[in-house]
């Protein structure tokens, strides 16, 4: 039987449109993932409850990581790769941006603030969290606000927005603080717990996470006037619009379905590993607004 040329052409076009995406049509991160069959997720080791190592060696858990896994599922569907392999790559505050830039990590979801300076180096997904920058201290230290830190040892984590803010405050107000920059949040809290610092400046949600894993959580308090409000986002390589589109849709679909509320409650209002403690950190009005109206803007651009 002969098929009319016009019908044959129509059939060919239809077949092409319905065919799975092939690597030759892809660019950037999606092409890399399609060709290797692997996606590499950047994660933290101690950013409780966002991204941190659980009981299974080398495998992260946390609020941000759960959203990162939603991206993995979206990529599987987009590329028709049901057997997509997931590789985990540990990052720190200092290495997270370079490892995204050089292709070692395809996407980093942890506790990374989206700001204008970082936007020059990487692209950010729509926001996944909003925090205020505050202080963690021992209740007996009687640290009520930042003015109480004059002449004292204060710790923060190297390579973070908090480190930059604390150093600027120290210089501008001539507070005479001795600022200790620890390699990660776990080390920052160790400095605080051991008495080498009287306060730990960081994002409030992370401070609650550190407090939850303390030997005696009730000995500690989060306080101080927030010095900044910041939005966390997942980092991807700059200019990779196709991959960012998949990432953003995976996150906003999780928001629209309401599943984000279950994920939030799992990590902020219920017992979490490693000690089964509850952060008792209800969702803020700022985060509710961010979920209702997602944006990839930094807080200072709002």
From Swiss-Prot:
Q: Name one process (GO BP) from the record.
A: D-amino acid transport
Ranges annotated as spanning the membrane: none
Kindly indicate where the leader peptide sits in this chain.
1-23
Lineage, top-rank taxon, reads Bacteria
Broad class of where this protein is predominantly found:
periplasm
Instruction: Please tell me one Gene Ontology term that the record gives under cellular component.
Output: extracellular space
Q: What keywords is this UniProt entry annotated with? A: Amino-acid transport, Periplasm, Signal, Transport
Q: Which SMART domains match?
A: PBPb (SM00062)
**Which InterPro entries has this protein been placed in?**
Bact_solute-bind_prot3 (IPR051455), Solute-binding_3/MltF_N (IPR001638)
Cysteine disulfide links:
none
Q: Where in the cell is it found?
A: Periplasm
Q: Which SUPFAM superfamilies match?
A: Periplasmic binding protein-like II
Q: Does the keyword Nucleotide-binding apply?
A: no
In the record, the note on similarity to other proteins reads: Belongs to the bacterial solute-binding protein 3 family.
Function, please? Binds L-glutamate and L-aspartate.
What is the recorded name of this protein? Answer: L-glutamate/L-aspartate-binding protein
């Amino acid at each position: 039987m002969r098929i009319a040329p016009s019908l044959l052409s129509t059939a060919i076009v239809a077949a092409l449109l319905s065919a799975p995406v092939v690597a030759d049509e892809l660019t950037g991160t999606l092409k890399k993932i399609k060709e290797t069959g692997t996606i590499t997720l950047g994660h933290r080791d101690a950013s409780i409850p966002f991204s941190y190592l659980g009981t299974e060696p080398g495998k992260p858990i946390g609020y941000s990581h759960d959203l990162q896994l939603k991206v993995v599922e979206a990529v599987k569907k987009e590329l028709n790769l049901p057997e997509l392999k997931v590789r985990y790559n540990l990052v720190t505050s200092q290495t997270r941006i370079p490892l995204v830039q050089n292709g070692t990590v395809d996407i980093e979801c942890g506790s990374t603030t989206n700001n204008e300076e970082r936007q020059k180096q990487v692209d950010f997904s729509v926001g996944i969290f909003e925090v205020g920058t505050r202080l963690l201290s021992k209740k007996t230290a009687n640290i009520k606000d930042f003015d109480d830190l004059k002449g004292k040892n204060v710790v923060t984590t190297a390579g973070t927005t908090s480190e930059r803010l604390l150093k600027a405050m120290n210089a501008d107000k001539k507070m005479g603080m001795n600022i200790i920059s620890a390699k990660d949040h776990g080390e920052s809290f160790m400095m605080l717990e051991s008495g080498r610092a009287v306060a730990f400046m960081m994002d409030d949600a992370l401070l609650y996470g550190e407090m939850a894993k303390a030997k005696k959580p009730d000995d500690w308090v989060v306080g101080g006037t927030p010095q900044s409000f910041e939005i966390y986002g997942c980092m991807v390589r700059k200019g990779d619009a196709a991959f960012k589109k998949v990432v953003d849709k995976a996150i906003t679909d999780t928001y629209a379905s309401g599943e984000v509320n279950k994920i939030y409650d799992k990590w902020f209002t219920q017992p979490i590993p490693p000690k089964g403690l509850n952060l008792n950190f209800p969702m803020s009005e700022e985060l509710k607004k961010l979920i209702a109206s997602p944006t990839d803007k930094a807080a200072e651009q709002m």
